[in-house]
């Protein structure tokens, strides 16, 4: 039935969003649904052939109610498939954007094996187009941060902190961090009273939780 594949794709996108919002592995996307996407594109191609045929045969006039109904259904099905594909791609691109910003705009291709927060990132789950997008977006942000805006922390929180010092809980081991007020060993389930600006990035990356 027309639209079934697109519905499956949207359900996959919703599951991904829910897992991300719940805090489960924000640094990893699920596998790109290439088979579903190709199936939807094939369906769109078939629908377009039907639409073109009805137009060529001039069967869409008001006297032919059946053909007119077929034409409208095919057009609406194509439009819905298009919207579902765009929504799926937009969701994944926004998550990739967040990964780049959370990791300070570094090149993922060179950082995945060296950066502790990216050690679990598997680029094979991305489509080829997504891999290219991720690489170029990371490079763009790196160039932006190293130019005239190099002295501004573009990855910082937009809202000013309400408190200078905050209590935080460690959600996963992050090793030692050195601050102006001493060295903290971030072990899972431990708690600290720290200056918010010192741990802002770790909060964004999911290592710490403000309590």
UniProtKB/Swiss-Prot annotation:
<dbReference type="Pfam" id="PF24997">
    <property type="entry name" value="PSF1_C"/>
</dbReference>
<dbReference type="Pfam" id="PF05916">
    <property type="entry name" value="Sld5"/>
</dbReference>
<keyword id="KW-0539">Nucleus</keyword>
<comment type="subunit">
    <text>Component of the GINS complex which is a heterotetramer of SLD5, PSF1, PSF2 and PSF3.</text>
</comment>
<dbReference type="InterPro" id="IPR005339">
    <property type="entry name" value="GINS_Psf1"/>
</dbReference>
<keyword id="KW-0235">DNA replication</keyword>
<dbReference type="InterPro" id="IPR056783">
    <property type="entry name" value="PSF1_C"/>
</dbReference>
<dbReference type="InterPro" id="IPR021151">
    <property type="entry name" value="GINS_A"/>
</dbReference>
<protein>
    <recommendedName>
        <fullName>DNA replication complex GINS protein PSF1</fullName>
    </recommendedName>
</protein>
<comment type="similarity">
    <text>Belongs to the GINS1/PSF1 family.</text>
</comment>
<comment type="function">
    <text>The GINS complex plays an essential role in the initiation of DNA replication.</text>
</comment>
<dbReference type="GO" id="GO:0000811">
    <property type="term" value="C:GINS complex"/>
</dbReference>
<dbReference type="GO" id="GO:1902983">
    <property type="term" value="P:DNA strand elongation involved in mitotic DNA replication"/>
</dbReference>
<dbReference type="InterPro" id="IPR036224">
    <property type="entry name" value="GINS_bundle-like_dom_sf"/>
</dbReference>
